[in-house]
């Protein structure tokens, strides 16, 4: 598919041909859901598990006689009521790192890019700014109509001047092409790709 390319200030800068194998895939909600769930699960941390009765090193021998002492009956120092005993119904370690087939991950990213190609994709020639100031960049965004949440993806690395200028703009995030992912693409209203980013993403799937 052919898409118009513009400069960061909104002026026309020609056209670019997008690979239909990457930007023309029909999105499927079930695939996108699986990939997003996998991403969010991988971001979760897990608390250190507590030690229950079977985990503590305490004697299991009865340490006092059953009757006659005037105290309660006990038979195990690992019981939760004793200092150093195991926790009753304590937190257990949970695995938040599920596996997901690489082909499914790749397909999910293609579908996310394709969904934005239908609505919300902008291609710019580069992120070079004559004046790398937040105020100037906001003016460019307003002129181009990039409202709401905007995700900007550059090539091998992010343009430093643009990154600094965009750092104070709420709802604007910048990533290198290698950092492109389904969750971030879908949660933003507008996806801005540089021509370098398009080349990197297409090479990522076709290489």
UniProtKB/Swiss-Prot annotation:
GO biological process, alphabetically ordered: translation
Any one GO molecular-function label of the UniProt entry: rRNA binding
Cystine bridges: none
Domain of life per record: Bacteria
One Pfam family of this chain: Ribosomal_L4
Keyword Ribonucleoprotein part of the UniProt annotation: yes
Gene Ontology CC annotations of this record: ribonucleoprotein complex; ribosome
Leader sequence segment: none
Keywords: Ribonucleoprotein, Ribosomal protein, RNA-binding, rRNA-binding
Quaternary structure, from the entry: Part of the 50S ribosomal subunit.
HAMAP family per record: Ribosomal_uL4_B
Recorded family membership: Belongs to the universal ribosomal protein uL4 family.
Biological role: One of the primary rRNA binding proteins, this protein initially binds near the 5'-end of the 23S rRNA. It is important during the early stages of 50S assembly. It makes multiple contacts with different domains of the 23S rRNA in the assembled 50S subunit and ribosome. Forms part of the polypeptide exit tunnel.
The protein's name: Large ribosomal subunit protein uL4
Organism: Erythrobacter litoralis (strain HTCC2594)
């Amino acid at each position: 598919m052919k898409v118009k390319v513009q400069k960061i200030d909104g002026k026309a800068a020609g056209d670019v041909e997008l690979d239909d194998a990457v930007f023309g895939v029909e999105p499927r909600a079930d695939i996108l859901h699986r990939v997003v769930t996998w991403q969010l699960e991988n971001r979760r941390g897990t608390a250190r598990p507590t030690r229950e009765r079977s985990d503590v090193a305490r004697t299991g021998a009865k340490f006092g006689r059953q009757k006659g002492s005037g105290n309660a009956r006990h038979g195990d120092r690992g019981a939760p009521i004793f200092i150093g005993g195991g926790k009753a119904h304590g937190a257990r370690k949970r695995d938040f790192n599920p596996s997901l087939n690489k082909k499914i991950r790749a397909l999910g990213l293609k579908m996310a890019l394709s969904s934005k190609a239908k609505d919300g994709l902008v291609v710019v020639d580069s992120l070079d700014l004559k004046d790398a100031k937040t105020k100037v960049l906001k003016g460019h965004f307003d002129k181009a109509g990039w409202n709401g949440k905007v995700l900007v993806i550059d090539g091998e690395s992010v343009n430093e001047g643009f990154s600094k200028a965009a750092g104070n703009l709420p709802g604007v995030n910048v990533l290198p092409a290698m950092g492109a992912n389904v969750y971030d693409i879908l949660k933003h209203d507008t996806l801005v790709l540089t021509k370098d980013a398009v080349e990197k993403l297409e090479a990522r799937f076709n290489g």
